[in-house]
Design a protein with these regions (language model features):
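Membrane-embedded alpha-helical segments and adjacent helix-loop junctions characteristic
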Residues: 18, 35, 48-49, 53-154, ...
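Transmembrane alpha-helix interface/packing and boundary motifs in multi-pass membrane proteins
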Residues: 37-46, 122-132, 168-179, 262-268, ...
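Hydrophobic alpha-helical transmembrane segments in multi-pass integral membrane proteins
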Residues: 183, 259-263, 311-330, 433-444
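Alpha-helical transmembrane segments of multi-pass membrane proteins
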Residues: 113-127, 153-174, 200-208, 342-355, ...
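Flexible hinge motifs at transmembrane-helix junctions and intramembrane kinks/re-entrant loops
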Residues: 19-27, 35-52, 69, 246-250, ...
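Lipid-exposed faces of alpha-helical membrane segments in multi-pass integral membrane proteins
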Residues: 4, 8, 31-38, 53, ...
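Juxtamembrane and boundary regions of transmembrane helices in multi-pass small-molecule transporters
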Residues: 1-16, 21, 133-136, 154-161, ...
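Structural signature of hydrophobic alpha-helical transmembrane segments
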Residues: 17-31, 74-86, 135-137, 212-217, ...
């Protein structure tokens, strides 16, 4: 039903007479963008399949030149996604992540509150070493469920919901403060590079976003879990004994540590995070050095690669077709942004970008809004980078689970009811917006983000 409505809306836009201020080419571009973003939003097809349809329709009907449609493939950010997918597969195959999870969780199974803290911290740590959000969800949720069972929490119990939701909320929301950790971050970085030739460096992004949207939000998730899903642990299993690390685990640890060091120091050596990730991914499958066979490479899930490429292509199409300029004028008039009123501008743009995620999904939000960043910067008087970074503040907040595809994957994996998830998601979003936006503004003011 919803998919049919989206398709009908797109067809109507494609064939109706141009509205005031629009050309026939702009109407066709708008129709394709509505189709693509709409199908992502309603989940009509797997995200990567919708992305491939975007490429196909754009080229068959000559909606835009190939260098616009496939612009995402020129971005180092897209290759960060590929490297991250390979590393995620390697982490799973070697058992390294399971080992880390046992080390982090087992000692805390005597206390529910301590176990919640351990789960949140583990999700944050994994965000640094495992770039794919879906991969972290698929890895962490079964381990958290097992840890919950060791602490006496049966499937469907209050403690079970608390632990699994803490893992899912942290995996996505705190991961938005770490550049390679989530798809929206990568789409934003790719859009900044392809649209404005403005690279977002790993360390710089970490400084701007992680202190508040990573660490402080992690603390907020812990408190929300304790409050909305209180429980008491009763250990039912003895402490686990870990075997010695395998040679594959040792080699993979070395690869991940080296990649992390190079990511953090990218401002010094100038090698983009994407090429570091790609090198690390290649190292994982090289003979002797690597930890995966050639055949295992074929089992890497490449869907996210084409999904991100399509989101970057939609962003470039929005800009090159002139739609971004028209949308920017409309948004500026609606929000009534004022030069010099930084706090008001910051709050309005953050709220706008947060709500936009409900209609576009959070991964697609930066693809849709990044082309408007220059307009936001011009009206507010901010540097372009600040306008772009404000988009990340918006997609770091999840109002509804369908905004975040990995969240939906985790809910299905853990068999969580949608309504029960909203019990925590909506209050957490409200508290986060009220408490964290002023704190984020103060932090950005301190580091000179507003010029």
């Amino acid at each position: 039903m919803l998919a049919g409505a989206v398709a009908l809306s797109a067809l109507t836009l494609a064939f109706m007479p141009p509205v005031a201020g629009m050309t026939p080419a702009m109407m066709k571009s708008c129709a394709l963008i509505v189709f693509t973003i709409g199908f992502w939003a309603v989940g009509a097809l797997p995200e990567h399949l919708t992305g491939l349809l975007f490429f196909l329709i754009a080229m068959v009907f000559a909606i835009a030149p190939a260098n616009v449609v496939f612009s995402g493939f020129e971005s180092a950010t897209l290759w960060l996604v590929l490297g991250g997918l390979i590393m995620a597969e390697a982490v799973n195959r070697t058992g390294l992540a399971q080992r880390l999870a046992v080390l982090m969780f087992d000692r805390y199974c005597d206390s529910y509150r301590h176990l919640v803290v351990a789960v949140v911290m583990a999700a944050i740590v994994l965000s640094f070493v495992m770039p794919a959000t879906v991969g972290r969800v698929l890895l962490l949720v079964p381990i958290v469920i097992a840890a919950g069972e060791r602490a006496g929490f049966a499937v469907g119990s209050r403690g079970y919901y608390g632990l699994t939701l803490a893992a899912l909320m942290t995996t996505y929301q705190c991961g938005t403060g770490i550049l390679p950790a989530n798809a929206p971050n990568l789409v934003l970085a790719g859009a900044a590079e392809t649209l404005y030739r403005l690279p977002l460096h790993y360390a710089e992004y970490l400084l701007w976003q992680f202190p508040v949207m990573g660490l402080v939000k992690g603390g907020l998730i812990i408190l929300a879990t304790w409050w909305f899903f209180p429980a008491t642990a009763s250990r039912v299993a003895a402490h686990a004994e870990l075997p010695a690390m395998t040679s594959e685990q040792k080699r993979l640890t070395a690869i991940l540590v080296l990649a992390l060091v190079l990511w953090i120091t990218d401002f010094a050596h100038g090698v983009k995070a994407g090429w570091v990730a790609l090198a690390a991914g290649i190292a994982c499958v090289l003979p002797r050095i690597g930890v995966m066979s050639y055949a295992a490479f074929n089992e890497v899930r490449f869907g996210a690669f084409f999904y991100v490429a399509a989101t970057l292509g939609t962003g470039m199409l929005t800009q090159q077709s002139g739609l971004s300029a028209a949308l920017g004028r409309g948004v500026d008039a609606t929000l009534a942004l004022q030069p010099g009123d930084d706090f008001r501008n910051f709050v309005l743009l953050s709220l706008f970008t947060t709500v936009a995620g409900v209609f576009t999904t959070n991964p697609a939000q930066p693809a849709v809004l990044a082309p408007l960043a220059q307009s936001f910067a011009d009206v507010t008087g901010w540097p372009l980078k600040t306008a772009l970074m404000t988009l990340a503040v918006g997609f770091s907040t999840m109002l509804l689970p369908h905004q975040v595809p990995p969240m939906m994957v985790g809910m299905q994996l853990a068999k969580l009811r949608y309504g029960a998830v909203l019990v925590m998601a909506l209050p957490l979003a409200a508290i986060g917006l009220v408490a964290l936006l002023p704190l984020q503004y103060a932090w950005w003011r301190l580091i000179g983000a507003f010029g």
